[in-house]
Amino acid sequence: MRQSGTSQPLLINMYLPDPVGDGLFKEGKSPSWGPLSPAVQKGSGQIQLWQFLLELLADRANAGCIAWEGGHGEFKLTDPDEVARRWGERKSKPNMNYDKLSRALRYYYDKNIMSKVHGKRYAYRFDFQGLAQACQPPPAHAHAAAAAAAAAAAAQDGALYKLPAGLAPLPFPGLSKLNLMAASAGVAPAGFSYWPGPNATAAAAATAALYPTPGLQPPPGPFGAVAAASHLGGHYH
């Protein structure tokens, strides 16, 4: 995709101290850029391939192996083996060759950083607009949204309390009482859904055993549930 000259000085301002004008690209002249900024030309192995190529292109002394060709960010590897050798030297990979380097370049196609110039061998084109966008750090709200989504997924999944399927109920009498209390109050106990609570018949039997006198009902609220649970504790041990 051919980019207009308006987007290209943005990248040059980011990585090169001597930006060029729009007319330079429109006229198809060869850019005469200065050396890359110190942050790019440190020579560390952390440099990315696209930065390395810009570093070579910034120095006309490298025209024997790589050079700008025309405008619109197009360049050509005049000696692809030499470019690959230098890239391997920078990354401490002595087995680097053009086949491996070209595979790395293809990674940039999907990122809209670079594209292959069809019909020209060893010719590529920088997409400066896509490269500038790729260099933008993700917004802070994106990290917050990702964290919130992960927390919501964990809560929905019950990951904090879920037990393996097929596990027999543990011999802990308090859990059966807890289920009975929750069932009487109409609330499911969070985190202990693995143990089913008593059915309605059992709850009615517990109430009748505690309050045999007609018209006498358990007190409202959790106190009645506690009383019923205490009385029926032996039935669920």
From Swiss-Prot:
Keywords on record: Developmental protein, Differentiation, DNA-binding, Neurogenesis, Nucleus, Transcription, Transcription regulation
Domain of life: Eukaryota
Region May mediate active transcriptional repression: start-end pairs: 129-237
Record-annotated DNA-binding residue ranges: 47-127
Cellular localization per UniProt: Nucleus
Principal location listed in the UniProt entry: nucleus
Gene3D superfamilies, per database record: Winged helix-like DNA-binding domain superfamily/Winged helix DNA-binding domain
Record GO cellular component, one term: nuclear speck
Known tissue expression: Specifically expressed in central serotonergic neurons. Also expressed in adrenal gland and to a lower extent in small intestine and eye.
GO biological process: cell differentiation; maternal behavior; neuron fate specification; neuron maturation; positive regulation of DNA-templated transcription; positive regulation of gene expression; positive regulation of transcription by RNA polymerase II; regulation of transcription by RNA polymerase II
A GO molecular function held by the record: sequence-specific double-stranded DNA binding
Function (record text): Functions as a transcriptional regulator. May function as a transcriptional repressor. Functions in the differentiation and the maintenance of the central serotonergic neurons. May play a role in cell growth.
Family assignment from sequence similarity: Belongs to the ETS family.
PANTHER family referenced in this protein's UniProt entry, alphabetically: ETS, PROTEIN FEV
Protein's UniProt name: Protein FEV
Naturally occurring in which organism (per UniProt): Rattus norvegicus
The organism's taxonomic lineage, starting at the top: Eukaryota, Metazoa, Chordata, Craniata, Vertebrata
Gene that specifies this protein: Fev
